[in-house]
Amino acid sequence: MPAYRSRTTTHGRNMAGARGLWRATGVKNSDFGKPIIAIVNSFTQFVPGHVHLKDLGQMVAREVEAAGGIAKEFNTIAVDDGIAMGHDGMLYSLPSRELIADSVEYMVNAHCADAMVCISNCDKITPGMLMAAMRLNIPAIFVSGGPMEAGKVTLGDGRKVSLDLVDAMVAAADDKISDADLAAIEEAACPTCGSCSGMFTANSMNCLSEALGLSLPGNGSTLATHAFRKNLFLEAGRRIVEVTRRHYEQDDASVLPRAIASKAAFLNAMSLDIAMGGSTNTVLHLLAIAQEGGVDFTMDDIDALSRKVPCLCKVAPNTANVHMEDVHRAGGIMAILGELDRAGLIDRDCPTVHAPTIGAAIDQWDIARSNDPQARELFLAAPGGVPTQVAFSQATLWPDLDLDREHGVIRSAKAPFSKDGGLAVLKGNVALDGCIVKTAGVDESILVFSGRAKVYESQDAAVSGILTGKVEAGDVVVIRYEGPKGGPGMQEMLYPTSYLKSKGLGKACALITDGRFSGGTSGLSIGHVSPEAAAGGTIGLVRDGDRIEIDIPNRSIRLAVPEDELAARRAEQDAKGWKPAQPRQRQVSAALKVYAQFAASADKGAVRILPE
């Protein structure tokens, strides 16, 4: 029987001082011996996805206490990728994931907490906390802040459209859009608290937490503003005490993160990711989370799944006017998992924090097969249409559910958006260890593409080239030395891809990089090229005018340069050192240098690898 970790600090004569300090936080004599549950919050006023979380940690704490536990809250940092985008602030985004994981470990281990409820939401916070959960392997339940409502605007020509943050970015660089329309788009794009409303990285990761079995049904899609989301927080507080007691008092290891998020659960999550056309960043994060838990989940697994899992759901940025609120109306993540289950693409036996197996959860919560009144009510939660930063502030309901699996937001495997899934792994001489493309966002006309390289040594240089007309139809924009080591920090490339769209080149150009992309990216955008340029990858040998051949159906990417020429270039580059040809005006802090020193390549999740 495992001993409660917290008794290290609450029991024994030698812990009199520690008990005195616990009492100073509000713990009473009668509380000693109860499980101590860490409420791992991430409230900040910098991030719309987290601005409403301030009081939610204490809401969970009260439920923990009512269920017989001691609740103690702390906060992690949270970087807003949208605000950090397009300048050197983006260098800090991915490294913040490791800092979040470390800070959770530090707090939980320093104070010997028995379990935790993780309140996350945006891009690096959910994966950072998931990494910590796998690392610590104590009972954990995730509940995120929820998606933002989509913006609604009427343009000058009378068109009414749903939109999001990325629409504002694209519109800003489109000379055809009037100042008045741009102002209207900007003001309407982000109307409420919550994670940005498309299937971007934040929402993708919160959806995947459902498939991993570590969060409750509806976590990925119930709007931040809706009253129904409150139930997820209350249930998390109650349930964490139950599963904690099962582990420590009944010796039940099946409730631990590593037992729940097994290899099979990661395959389920990746199948969901491919089916819903999630952000390419999810690949990076799932690899990192798996590594923390010692799970043998690799790019080869992702490649194999991408060849058999169809695309069953298309959401912004992969299609216009469809956002997370629409996915929710169609049954949310449990509905997509249900369609994958019907196609034999889900392992039903994986346990979860809320049901004995994911199969049992699907049977209850998939509205296409279940008449469970709780499920059918949950997925009627609709946007309120009122700008707000207050959680649970509206209770609007859809008039009906979207159960159309032939033409609706969620499709069956018999009527998919495409037989090929929404993500693919490409390999070839320019990416020997692989790279990632979000096929759900690629137009069918350019699934096979060949073009001349236009090489840039930084994201800033590429943006300048695109905006000044130096990039033309038929070009393959190459942005290098932006990987985990080379950036450092592996910046997102949302501005270059958005500007290609605004210049009318979204279907006429490709972009490849050893950096990564925002979840808001679409188009022929190929990221995570591994090995990266700074690690001696072939992408560092590409020269202007070289032909690059991309064949997504055959999963290949090739630099059409003879091997002897590449060998000569490599010898020349070895002599010079693997660094940008033109010096960059970039201030790299000591903190970023530490990350770069230990960062692995993208195919390993860009985690830190310590020397043995």
Curated annotation (Swiss-Prot):
Its EC number is 4.2.1.9. It is an enzyme of class 4 (lyase). Its cofactor is [2Fe-2S] cluster; Mg(2+). Gene3D superfamilies: IlvD/EDD C-terminal domain-like. GO terms for molecular function: 2 iron, 2 sulfur cluster binding; dihydroxy-acid dehydratase activity; magnesium ion binding. It comes from the Bacteria. It holds the Pfam family ILVD_EDD_N. GO terms for biological process: isoleucine biosynthetic process; L-valine biosynthetic process. [2Fe-2S] cluster binds at residues 122, 196. The modification N6-carboxylysine is found at residue 124. GO terms for cellular component: cytosol. Binds 1 [2Fe-2S] cluster per subunit. This cluster acts as a Lewis acid cofactor. InterPro entries: Dihydro-acid_dehy_C, DihydroxyA_deHydtase, DiOHA_6PGluconate_deHydtase_CS, ILV_EDD_C, ILV_EDD_N, IlvD/EDD_N. Homodimer. Belongs to the IlvD/Edd family. This is Dihydroxy-acid dehydratase. It comes from Paracoccus denitrificans (strain Pd 1222).
